[in-house]
């Protein structure tokens, strides 16, 4: 499991407190679906995903993105216990949804890009390093059931 220092945890928590989860969630999931189009197969009930503008304007993408980022907020609250925090979501994505665990890593990287675009100079290399560690740890926790 990934170890986060007190400074890294503080940097993550500080930035997360300024995050607009609804806006950033839709943007993150939308970007994932545009940049990695094969991920769209997990969202075939979302309606029109035929173009980047259709995806980014899709209310179901926005709503699910908010749900994803709200769940990610649980990671912020439980940085030292991610495996337990995401046990049920890992089971759901593995057993029922059959999501390739690599997609969790891709979404984490997209989240880092969203953070960089939203926070600019505040998203220093040190802050990025902390977030990269966290999104990697979350991806591992979400993929735990697969092993």
Swiss-Prot record:
CDD domains: Hb-beta-like. It comes from the Eukaryota. Residues 3-147 form the Globin domain. Keywords: Heme, Iron, Metal-binding, Oxygen transport, Phosphoprotein, Transport. The modification Phosphoserine is found at residues 14, 51. One of its GO terms (molecular function) is oxygen carrier activity. One of its GO terms (cellular component) is blood microparticle. Red blood cells. GO terms for biological process: hydrogen peroxide catabolic process. InterPro entries: Globin (IPR000971), Globin-like_sf (IPR009050), Globin/Proto (IPR012292), Hemoglobin_b (IPR002337), Hemoglobin_oxygen_transport (IPR050056). Heme b binds at residues 64, 93. Belongs to the globin family. Heterotetramer of two alpha chains and two epsilon chains in early embryonic hemoglobin Gower-2; two zeta chains and two epsilon chains in early embryonic hemoglobin Gower-1. The epsilon chain is a beta-type chain of early mammalian embryonic hemoglobin. This is Hemoglobin subunit epsilon. The gene is HBE1.
């Amino acid at each position: 499991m990934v170890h986060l220092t007190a400074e890294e945890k503080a940097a993550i928590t500080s930035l997360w407190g300024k995050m607009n989860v609804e806006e950033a969630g839709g943007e993150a999931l939308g970007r994932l679906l545009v940049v990695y189009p094969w991920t769209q197969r997990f969202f075939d009930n979302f309606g029109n995903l035929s173009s980047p503008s259709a995806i980014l304007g899709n209310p179901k993408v926005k709503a699910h993105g908010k749900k994803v980022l709200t769940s990610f907020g649980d990671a912020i609250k439980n940085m030292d216990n991610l495996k337990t925090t995401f046990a049920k979501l890992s089971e759901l994505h593995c057993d029922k949804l059959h999501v390739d665990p690599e997609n969790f890593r891709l979404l984490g990287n997209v989240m880092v890009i969203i953070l960089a675009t939203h926070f600019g100079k505040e998203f220093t290399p040190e802050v990025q390093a902390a977030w990269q560690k966290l999104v990697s740890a979350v991806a591992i926790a979400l993929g735990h059931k697969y092993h």
